[in-house]
């Protein structure tokens, strides 16, 4: 277990020194605290007869879902340094198993072996050389792969506009491509006066009501003529069938 933990600590110190944000004393203090934390964590979860057992528990992982590894953060706090000063990648996974330590940069890349051990007799210099060789190789491949993909992407971006302008279309003009014609819309029929909205308000004033018709928009009663009883003047009498004027019957 000592060799595997030493490989992990060398791996982290190598990354921190490449970032060149911490002093040598701070890096050594961080390496010492991380070694003690991993030894305490792994001592009851180490199975040489079955290396895959407890692998998830021993794993050191940093990604978009877990941006800070708790063990590494604890080592930073115990050594009085900031986690951000380590300069770790945004996606990093370390599997610490008996006789082998593996790493993966990024969640979609392939894993590589940081160090493998056949016995516990290897000294720190040999472990440091193994970690350094593996780390130098993977970091160079990782950065060169990302840069080559960026160059391919930029080439594709440059080629696509040329392919379009090399074969112009004889049908469409630039003005048609930039400013397409507006669709033709049929005018809506005008609303009849007196239409009402659903909320009870009028859209327009209702037309005047013709003479003799009741006003449909109001609740007033329609006009009805009042019956008048005719009363004959004094001196005029009438029977059932005709009127009799006494002045007309007097002799002249």
UniProtKB/Swiss-Prot annotation:
PROSITE patterns: BTG_1 (PS00960), BTG_2 (PS01203). Residues 138-165 are annotated as: Disordered. It comes from the Eukaryota. GO terms for biological process: negative regulation of mitotic cell cycle. Pfam families: BTG. Gene3D superfamilies: Anti-proliferative protein, N-terminal domain. One of its GO terms (cellular component) is cytoplasm. Belongs to the BTG family. Overexpression impairs serum-induced cell cycle progression from the G0/G1 to S phase. This is Protein BTG3. It comes from Sus scrofa. The lineage of its organism: Eukaryota, Metazoa, Chordata, Craniata, Vertebrata.
